[in-house]
Amino acid sequence: MKLQLLRNATLKLDYAGTTILIDPDFGSKHSRPSFTGRSPNPMVELPVSTDEILAGVELVIVSHLHADHFDKIAQELVPKHLPLVCQPGDEEKIRSFGFTDVTPLTERLTYEGIRLIRRDGNHGSGPVLEKMGNVIGLTIEADGEPSIYWAGDTILYPPVRETIATSAPDIIITHSCGAEWDDLLIVMDAEQTIEICRIAPEDTRIIATHMEALDHATVSRDDLQDYANAHDIAKHKLLIPSDGEVLHLSAPNA
């Protein structure tokens, strides 16, 4: 498989012969308001053009409708005929944008031999959870490919631990910028990401994303790497890609 981190949560995945676009946010640098007063968002430009991002895309996955996961520009530019998978409850809103092939991921579905399984997520805890709304993660599996657990916009909480324990994924993709809302954590921070490294199977690789793009983040790539080094996490265990970076990963024993 080939995975390209584009920016924040936006990923392009070549997997089992299908090109998948996950959580497209195409907004230009500083095109949206600040969350904290520190900087307009996004804080950086996309590393490649939207034409290049969309080239070859056959399936779109949208975890939830926050602007940094499916912004107005992406809603306009993503071809409306492409099959789009979303969380239950978002399908009618997405159809209102003109998309004609929208499927809510209630439990599991199969697309061209790729198995998608819905996983729970908590976009924060306590009073902030209602403000953030519902989100999903998912596992992605196909014969001959590494299994992926894409946790999505979630903190580390018992269902995430359970997913790791029961599915034993080859790859775990985390959102690790330590973003805060009302001084409460709404995605994983360095400590939680390193805990993921510890509880994951020995051969599982963790890919930390959703970093250095939004002004309510509290953890940079360097911060996370420093924390990993201080806790003796091997470099091959935790990957922290730059925007635009491409990773080539194989299934065990492939």
Where are these regions (language model features)?
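Catalytic core of the metallo-beta-lactamase
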Residues: L5-A16, T110-D170, M188
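Structural motif
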Residues: T18-I20, E58-L59, P83, P146-I148, ...
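Metallo-beta-lactamase
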Residues: I53, C86-E145, D226-N253
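Zn-dependent metallo-beta-lactamase
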Residues: M1-M43, D222-D226, K235-K237, D243-E245
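Pre-active-site segment of Zn-dependent metallo-hydrolases
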Residues: T18-I61, K72-Q75, G126, T154-T166
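Cap/insert and terminal regions of metallo-dependent hydrolase folds
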Residues: G89, I155-D243
